[in-house]
Amino acid sequence: MLLMKLSVAIICKNEEKLIQRAIVSVQAADEIVILDTGSTDRTESVVAALNLPQVKFIKDSYVWKDDFADARNAAMDCCTGDWCLLLDADDFMAADSIPEIRAAIAAMPSARTIDCKILHEKSPDFYFYPKLIRLNAGVRMVGACHEVTSVRDAGPHAGTMILGYSENHQNDTGRVLRIMGQMYAADPTNSRTLYYLGREHYYRKDDAKAIPLLEACVKCSTFLAERADAYLYLARIFWRNQRGCDARAACMNALIINANFREALLFMATLSFEHNAVRWREFAAHATNERVLFVRNPP
């Protein structure tokens, strides 16, 4: 069996506190490429102190453009492996992920992307996302924020990535909103942009901006999981604005799209009188969450 070379591509800026954890979690990879986008802290010296021969730290060659896909593509272009694992400096891989990944890329010779299971460090939420990309197969990252692969192959997942949240992200609370706003200005009909920008305004309780964005998303999106999630966000917005009928209608639309959407079933219980709520909770207990975009309330 031909042994596939595995690269890891990390983009970073001012991650002196967390980048060691990220690197150590993938040190079994053949190559670790770190593209620095302008650090002014000790990130480089922390990396150098690890003294790992497979690590390549690249600085002063990339100008940050408020575009995560562009930076990830630049990092991938510096990799020499057959496959590339995309990792952020504040994230890390669970134990045994690299052996799982090696087995997967050997077993799926025709795949162009492979999903990883994505967990959150401080919550039980999870989802699956293509973090493994075959290099030189025409796959690129697209989207300045909440970027995605240009293609996505179906198949089993491999490895578990745990998302952290660095102080840099916490201190730059407007970054996502700023970049998503630029994406919306460039293409106001992109359903993915509408979804994520609407969700961002939902988090900020700016409902007057969130509602039209999410309503536009459910009208134009062809991705059913995205539409169902957008409907659920609309239901939550309507409910906190004392629009009970609209909330129930939006939540029901989410369930019409996917009757296995456990979070929507539980929220329908919240929206119902107790004698009906009992039934919704029973339905939720048997829901599989199949084809759900994000599993935020796992059993």
Model-derived regions: residue spans:
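Conserved donor nucleotide-binding strand/loop of the catalytic core
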Residues: 44-74, 78
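Cell-envelope/extracellular polymer assembly enzymes that use nucleotide-activated donors
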Residues: 5-7, 31
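Short, well-formed alpha-helical segments that are part of the catalytic scaffolds
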Residues: 10-28
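A conserved acidic beta->alpha catalytic loop
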Residues: 25, 36-46, 64, 88-92
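Acidic helix N-cap motif at the loop->helix transition within catalytic regions
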Residues: 17-20, 41-50, 96
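Catalytic-site signature of metal-activated, phosphate-bearing donor transferases
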Residues: 69-76, 93-212
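Short aromatic/hydrophobic "clamp" motif used to bind/position activated sugar donors
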Residues: 84
